[in-house]
Structure formats: C-alpha cells, structure tokens
Amino acid sequence: MSTTNDNTTMQRLMITDMRPLSMDSIITSLTKEIITHKFIYLINNECIVRKLDERQATFTFLVNYEMKLLHKVGSTKYKKYTEYNTKYGTFPMPIFINHGGFLECIGIKPTKHTPIIYKYDLNP
C-alpha cells in the first residue's frame, strides 16, 4: 500500500511541476492553429496594399493574432493566455524581409520555448 501512495504522490508532484510547460504547449499549439499560410498571406497582403513599415506590419500581425485567439478560445481563456504570453514572452513575432519597399512576412521568430517557424512549415 505504501508503494501506491508514494507513486501517487510522485505523480502529483510531476503534474504540479509541469504546469508552466503544459500552458506553454497549449499556447504553442494554439499559435500553430492560428498562424497558417492563409494568416501570413493576409498579413502580406495588408503590407503591400497599405505599404506598411515594419512597426505597422508587426502591430497588424499582433492585432490579427490576438483577434483570432480571442475568437478561438473565448474571453476568459484569452485573458489567461495573453497574461501568460506577456509574462513569459511567448507572443509570436513576425520576421519580415524588405522587397524594394514592400515587406513580406516569411515566418515567426523563435521564443523561449519554440524554434523559428518559416511560413513554408505552417499549416495550409
């Protein structure tokens, strides 16, 4: 009996210790669902049509990301996720290249827990 209690206690400790990682994996998964080829295409279209500079393009990217996140998870979880993103610096940030005055988003910068993601690696 004592062995079972020790195992249960150990499992509880492991679950408690891994909470930040599980939240990070949820956010990473949501980010991969939100930021798709279509999402990047829309950002690139905005950059071309409105002739945005890098600051404006980054702002447009983040606003669109947050709106999709809010729509996907609802207001209660949205607040929790954005607080986590702010605290741990896990907001996805775009990588832009300049094509003669027009910006193109080619991917997402790496964060503390995620590698660099290029638009060709994203979901369609």
Curated annotation (Swiss-Prot):
Keyword RNA-binding attributed: no
Statement: the UniProt record of this protein carries the keyword Membrane: no
UniProt-listed GO biological process terms: symbiont-mediated perturbation of host apoptosis; symbiont-mediated suppression of host cytoplasmic pattern recognition receptor signaling pathway via inhibition of IRF3 activity; symbiont-mediated suppression of host cytoplasmic pattern recognition receptor signaling pathway via inhibition of IRF7 activity; symbiont-mediated suppression of host cytoplasmic pattern recognition receptor signaling pathway via inhibition of RIG-I activity; symbiont-mediated suppression of host cytoplasmic pattern recognition receptor signaling pathway via inhibition of TBK1 activity; symbiont-mediated suppression of host JAK-STAT cascade via inhibition of STAT2 activity; symbiont-mediated suppression of host toll-like receptor signaling pathway; symbiont-mediated suppression of host type I interferon-mediated signaling pathway
Taxonomic placement: Viruses, Riboviria, Orthornavirae, Negarnaviricota, Haploviricotina
UniProt keywords, alphabetically: Host mitochondrion, Host-virus interaction, Inhibition of host innate immune response by virus, Inhibition of host interferon signaling pathway by virus, Inhibition of host IRF3 by virus, Inhibition of host IRF7 by virus, Inhibition of host RIG-I by virus, Inhibition of host RLR pathway by virus, Inhibition of host STAT2 by virus, Inhibition of host TBK1 by virus, Inhibition of host TLR pathway by virus, Interferon antiviral system evasion, Modulation of host cell apoptosis by virus, Viral immunoevasion
Family, as annotated: Belongs to the pneumovirus non-structural protein 2 family.
Motif residue range(s): DLNP: 121-124
Domain comment as written in the entry: The DNLP motif has IFN suppressive functions like binding to host MAP1B.
Biological role stated in the UniProt entry: Plays a major role in antagonizing the type I IFN-mediated antiviral response. Acts cooperatively with NS1 to repress activation and nuclear translocation of host IFN-regulatory factor IRF3. Interacts with the host cytoplasmic sensor of viral nucleic acids RIGI and prevents the interaction with its downstream partner MAVS. Together with NS2, participates in the proteasomal degradation of host STAT2, IRF3, IRF7, TBK1 and RIGI through a NS-degradasome involving CUL2 and Elongin-C. The degradasome requires an intact mitochondrial MAVS. Induces host SOCS1 expression.
InterPro entries recorded: RSV_NS2
GO cellular component annotations of the record: host cell mitochondrion
Binding partners and assembly: Monomer (instable). Homomultimer. Heteromultimer with NS1. Interacts with host RIGI (via N-terminus); this interaction prevents host signaling pathway involved in interferon production. Interacts with host MAP1B/microtubule-associated protein 1B.
Subcellular localization, as worded in the UniProt entry: Host mitochondrion
Protein name stated in the entry: Non-structural protein 2
